[in-house]
């Protein structure tokens, strides 16, 4: 028997079968809330594999994270909400929008310029104007012991002080 390379569609189909009437009793009864911690656990396991530079384990953990994404999308699809296609459509649109230096007429020659542009576009997208609004965008589920990445702190300060990109780059 020939080994077939599975696709994202195969994973969606597997999750759909597991949640079907003749599927797995455990998978069938799960909700967003009941598997919330599973999503976090898989993300932390992927982060741990990165920290340990264990690429074989990272591959496995990324699969587990992807399975969680598909699982949540399938739950929502069953409830008449968004689909996995909507998730993919949304992230593709976001990546294109936030990379105008690649997909449009924007300009960014350094990683720092990309981050500044990214955060400005995100601010515009989310209609965040004040430091309070920026800080309110920090996820409530973020554990208190986990510091924000340095660029998030810089972002909040830059937006609060309304320093222009030109001023920042000229210093």
Regions found by a protein language model. Give the residues of each.
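Flexible "arm" and connector segments at domain edges
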Residues: 1-61, 67-171
């Amino acid at each position: 028997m020939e080994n077939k390379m599975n696709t994202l569609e195969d994973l969606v189909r597997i999750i759909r079968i597991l949640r079907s009437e003749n599927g797995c009793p455990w998978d069938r009864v799960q909700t967003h809330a009941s598997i919330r911690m599973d999503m976090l656990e898989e993300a932390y396991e992927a982060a741990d594999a990165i920290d340990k530079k264990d690429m074989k384990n990272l591959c496995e953990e990324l699969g587990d994270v992807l399975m969680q994404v598909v699982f949540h999308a399938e739950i929502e699809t069953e409830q008449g909400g968004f689909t996995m296609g909507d998730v993919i459509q949304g992230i593709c649109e976001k990546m294109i929008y936030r990379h105008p230096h690649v997909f449009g007429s924007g300009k960014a020659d350094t990683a720092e310029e990309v981050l500044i542009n990214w955060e400005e576009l995100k601010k515009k997208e989310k209609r965040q104007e004040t430091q309070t609004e920026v800080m309110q965008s920090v996820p409530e589920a973020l554990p208190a012991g986990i510091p924000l990445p340095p660029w998030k702190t810089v972002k909040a300060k830059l937006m609060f002080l309304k320093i222009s990109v030109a001023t920042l780059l000229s210093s």
